[in-house]
């Protein structure tokens, strides 16, 4: 195993109240689903150890309240995030239309060093509902994601555990890449040439 230090990845889940943020988190971490979650007050988090490319990392997944009156709690929760997950309900057009403001809210509150490259993942949840109730097509959601810099997009059912594992695999990978970029980026903006052309003593083992 690698002797590199253990990595803690902070992931924030945002979206309107009732879109299934808590359900997604619980399905991924605990493999459980409940149809009777109460609205999250403030924020709550769960942790899960996962392997990303043979590297063991701990994901700290924050589930934040979707109610507007709790959005002011943001700064403390958003700071230090390595990835932001934007969740909407495919059967609720209002929750989809709110994604833009959730994304903007996150970028303002979290103040990532490089907002343009900060990793987001979009999840359209509740695909287990009747097709006739669906209000947001996959095409419309994908068009939105492409317009925001090709954000990865997943359609999930937290209830039936559809695509949840796959979505969080990409979330973990994106978060780790962001964490490493922050760790090694420092305050340098110019690329560093890692190929040293000078001769070195010793064997090339």
Swiss-Prot record:
PROSITE patterns in UniProt: RAB
Binding site for GTP: 17-23, 33-40, 66, 125-128, 157-159
Amino-acid biosynthesis recorded as keyword: no
Pfam short name (any one): Ras
Activity regulation text: Rab activation is generally mediated by a guanine exchange factor (GEF), while inactivation through hydrolysis of bound GTP is catalyzed by a GTPase activating protein (GAP).
Motif (Effector region): 37-45
Lipidation (S-geranylgeranyl cysteine): 203, 205
GO biological process, one term: vacuole fusion, non-autophagic
One Gene Ontology cellular component annotation held by this UniProt entry: fungal-type vacuole membrane
CDD domains in the record: Rab7 (cd01862)
Residue positions where Cysteine methyl ester is found in the record: 205
Keyword Hydrolase listed: no
Record keywords: GTP-binding, Lipoprotein, Methylation, Nucleotide-binding, Prenylation
GO molecular function: GTP binding; GTPase activity
Consequence of gene loss (knockout): Displays highly fragmented vacuoles.
Annotated NCBIfam families: small_GTP
Family that this chain belongs to: Belongs to the small GTPase superfamily. Rab family.
General function of this protein: Ypt/Rab-type GTPases are key regulators of membrane trafficking and intracellular vesicular transport. They act as molecular switches that convert between GTP-bound and GDP-bound states, and regulate virtually all steps of membrane traffic from the formation of the transport vesicle at the donor membrane to its fusion at the target membrane. In the GDP-bound state, Ypt proteins are predominantly cytosolic, solubilized through the interaction with a GDP dissociation inhibitor (GDI).
Protein name from the UniProt record: Ypt/Rab-type GTPase avaA
Upper lineage: Eukaryota, Fungi, Dikarya, Ascomycota, Pezizomycotina
